[in-house]
Amino acid sequence: MIQMTSVLDVADNSGAKKVFCIKVLGGSKRKYASIGDVIVVSVREALPNSKVKKGDVAKAVIVRTKREVGRPDGSYIKFDGNSAVLINKDMEPIGTRIFGPVARELRARKFMKIISLAPEVL
């Protein structure tokens, strides 16, 4: 469960390391985002000579959360940290690699490029 002011790790090689959630997209009164949701973020930490710089505003899709997410078969999945992947206006990832596992819920949200780049889908 991600809300405004949440700090997330970045799970791609776009150059950003930490991002700060400034808006949850999907309705004016929406407070929380979960796996597969798109948020607006500000880059708080970035590597030098990278595609994104500190202070840049971008969109990101959440790929891992500490909060458990229920599945239709009754099982739950949760991760050790909150992570996101930066995306462009066409909903394609900015980076060319994804680090760590991602949740299967991204497939239902049509983020196939992220699914194909991820080393493991749980």
Swiss-Prot record:
The gene is rplN. Binds to 23S rRNA. Forms part of two intersubunit bridges in the 70S ribosome. GO terms for cellular component: cytosolic large ribosomal subunit. Part of the 50S ribosomal subunit. Forms a cluster with proteins L3 and L19. In the 70S ribosome, L14 and L19 interact and together make contacts with the 16S rRNA in bridges B5 and B8. Belongs to the universal ribosomal protein uL14 family. It comes from the Bacteria. The keyword Signal does not apply. This is Large ribosomal subunit protein uL14. One of its GO terms (molecular function) is structural constituent of ribosome. Keywords: Ribonucleoprotein, Ribosomal protein, RNA-binding, rRNA-binding. GO terms for biological process: translation. PANTHER family: 50S/60S RIBOSOMAL PROTEIN L14/L23, LARGE RIBOSOMAL SUBUNIT PROTEIN UL14M.
